[in-house]
């Protein structure tokens, strides 16, 4: 350190004296995978792939890539504007990289780009839904194993009708949730196909490497028909996903209905745990006027 100025030496020594955990940078936050995120990914990929394919001057590609990176970095700042359409994202790229950045749009359209980010976002949300559903089903199965010999009433038309094993009842609910999980897997396979490169309606004569683009964006396959990509699948796949969510809501709603029905009895057979946070999650609370009463 003999060549360092006194202030620099002091700073280095101070850094060396910090605890190990203080010297380690905080792990980077996961980016929000919204429309802005996917537009950025598509623009980065188009720059690289088109340069490799000879559709873009390789000497120009680094300048364009740096400009796109600055747009993405600016959009990732807290409270920053995050454009969600091609026509609002492009002016930012032109500002940072020059008008030449529009050359990466060869063979593209807002139609296939928007269809692509919708599919990518839907794919992410299906994965999140599947994870939460698996957690709920696992809890049902664990409770069923613990309550195989617990006898509870079952209801028809809102009236106690027959005694049953609580474990058997819960496994019935788990079976319904398992079918919902199967539907998610089947739908995911249809959603996990890239529309990128179909341009709009009739496709394009530009020699785009659609498979390379799909691989970069993490899609398992391609949407083969250009008209289907932006006009048909973009309409029916969200409806299919909505049907899955509705089915899950029906199963969960039936379970909640049973809990609420028996909770109104003088001697309910399920008591919800009190308290908030990790102890009860706010499932039930004491009446403000009648301390003997619990409200679900």
Language model: regions and residue ranges:
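Gram-negative bacterial Sec-dependent N-terminal signal peptides
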Residues: 4-19
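A helix-coil-helix interface module used to build multimeric assemblies
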Residues: 23-203, 208-215, 283-295
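Conserved helix-loop functional segments at active or binding sites
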Residues: 146, 183-186, 190, 219-222, ...
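Glycine-rich anion/phosphate-binding loop at the beta-strand->alpha-helix junction
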Residues: 180, 230-296
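Active-site-adjacent "gating/activation" loops or surface patches in catalytic cores
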Residues: 210-234
């Amino acid at each position: 350190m003999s060549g360092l100025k006194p202030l620099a030496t002091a700073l280095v020594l101070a850094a060396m004296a910090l605890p190990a955990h203080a010297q380690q940078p905080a792990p980077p936050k996961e980016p929000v995978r919204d429309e802005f995120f996917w537009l950025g990914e598509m623009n980065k990929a188009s720059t690289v792939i088109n340069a490799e394919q000879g559709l873009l001057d390789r000497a120009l590609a680094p300048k364009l890539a740096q400009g796109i990176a600055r747009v993405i970095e600016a959009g990732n700042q807290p409270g920053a504007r995050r454009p969600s359409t091609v026509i609002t994202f492009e002016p930012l790229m032109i500002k940072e990289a020059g008008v030449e950045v529009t050359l990466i749009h060869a063979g593209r359209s807002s139609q296939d780009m928007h269809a692509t980010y919708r599919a990518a976002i839907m794919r992410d949300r299906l994965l999140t839904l599947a994870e939460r559903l698996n957690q709920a089903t696992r809890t049902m199965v664990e409770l069923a194993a613990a309550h195989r010999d617990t006898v509870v009433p079952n209801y028809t038309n809102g009236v106690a009708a027959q005694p049953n094993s609580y474990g058997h009842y819960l496994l019935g609910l788990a079976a319904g949730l398992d079918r919902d999980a199967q539907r998610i897997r089947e739908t995911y396979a249809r959603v996990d196909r890239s529309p990128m490169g179909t341009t709009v309606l009739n496709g394009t004569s530009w020699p785009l490497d659609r498979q390379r683009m799909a691989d970069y964006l993490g899609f398992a396959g391609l949407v083969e028909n250009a008209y289907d990509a932006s006009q048909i699948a973009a309409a029916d796949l969200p409806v299919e996903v909505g049907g899955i969510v509705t089915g899950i809501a029906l199963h969960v709603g039936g379970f909640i209905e049973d809990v609420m029905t028996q909770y109104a009895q003088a001697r309910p057979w399920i008591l919800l745990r009190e308290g908030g946070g990790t102890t009860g999650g706010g499932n039930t609370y004491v009446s403000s006027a009648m301390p003997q009463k619990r409200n679900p």
